[in-house]
Amino acid sequence: MAITIVSVRARQIFDSRGNPTVEADVKLSDGYLARAAVPSGASTGIYEALELRDGGSDYLGKGVSKAVENVNIIIGPALVGKDPTDQVGIDNFMVQQLDGTVNEWGWCKQKLGANAILAVSLAVCKAGAHVKGIPLYEHIANLAGNKNLVLPVPAFNVINGGSHAGNKLAMQEFMILPVGASSFKEAMKMGAEVYHHLKSVIKKKYGQDATNVGDEGGFAPNIQENKEGLELLKTAIAKAGYTGKVVIGMDVAASEFYGSDQTYDLNFKEENNNGSQKISGEALKDLYKSFVAEYPIVSIEDPFDQDDWAHYAKLTSEIGEKVQIVGDDLLVTNPKRVEKAIKEKACNALLLKVNQIGSVTESIEAVKMSKRAGWGVMASHRSGETEDTFIADLSVGLATGQIKTGAPCRSERLAKYNQLLRIEEELGSEAVYAGANFRKPVEPY
């Protein structure tokens, strides 16, 4: 007898910020239960698929009872009897038939909510791996047609600014990437050591309260100069003895400080802001170039506003060989926007966030498209996370070569890194760590 889905149930749980989110249980005819939860972001791109929230006063408008109900009443009953290994069939059925809403960028999940559909999509994927009797990462690799499993380079977000932190820093994330490690295990060691050195450097310079952590486990010292953030990382890396082995990445999240006057305000968090730090896209581009000249920066994410395609293309053509230019808000993991960016040479790497697009199948499509264009791919958490570890397996199965899921601090972040340690151990001598090849760990599949 083929194993089929016997029930799909959802519930409201809480993410790492104390906001409601959706968890789904997929039960199979052999008694197996697959469970998955979805995350949510703070700095969200306007082109992301719809995250359905209840509004009203309960949970300050952030309840997800409608999304939960959509799983329990619409999606669940419709999936009973289906084969959990048919990921594409189930995803397309949910997205195109049960939901069916479309905007100019494709299937937008406005009826059922991307959070409802994704919770089920992730749980179905876990169920499919169980039925096949293989690890989740292997099942994902098979779904994508990828033959090479790769452990990603972790990008640890160790200094927080932007919408993630209460300091004056405009740029959202300052990350460290242990590209010189020989294994994921060693990368974790390097990351953790640099993190602790950074903590003592910050404590000494700014005092104990500067070592309080932000949503993703990074520090949020009250600094205003973005360059100061880079300087702190450079110092911590040197103190840990990893100069040349640990490099730097940034997530600017520039859409958060782009104004209607088409300028970028590096002082956007100041209450008595006189506009003295507003700069043009051209000036911001030159600022990045000066950073890259002075610091070992290998990756810059969302350097411009999500609609500022022109400056993206300029920056990519000027420094894209040396530095990865990552589209997050620009692309929102949407295959149609990825296609446009490839055509316009707007960036050269995809940030993969499953909850921006809302299904496993569409996520795989965006990754394959990016890899065929010669781009890099970085799998990513969201700032509001759960203990779910799906993205760890996803990054190995799709050989993304990179993952960012916070600092080596806070259990909802470590859950993913710890899962990657387990996967590396399970693969044994077969384990390959992306290392210096993080931008292109495998040939396109």
Curated annotation (Swiss-Prot):
Keywords: Allergen, Cytoplasm, Glycolysis, Lyase, Magnesium, Metal-binding
Annotated coiled-coil segments of the chain: none
Residues the entry annotates as binding Mg(2+): D251, E301, D328
Pathway entry: Carbohydrate degradation; glycolysis; pyruvate from D-glyceraldehyde 3-phosphate: step 4/5
GO CC annotations, alphabetized: phosphopyruvate hydratase complex
Record note on cofactor: Mg(2+) is required for catalysis and for stabilizing the dimer.
EC number, as in UniProt: 4.2.1.11
Biological process annotations from GO: glycolytic process
Binding site for substrate: H164, E173, E301, D328, S380, H381, R382, S383, K404
Compartment annotation: Cytoplasm
Alphabetized GO MF terms: magnesium ion binding; phosphopyruvate hydratase activity
Enzyme class name: lyase
Major localisation: cytoplasm
Residues of the active site: E216, K353
Pfam families in alphabetical order: Enolase_C (PF00113), Enolase_N (PF03952)
HAMAP family reported for this sequence: Enolase
Sequence similarity: Belongs to the enolase family.
Protein name as annotated: Enolase 1
Record organism: Hevea brasiliensis
UniProt gene name: ENO1
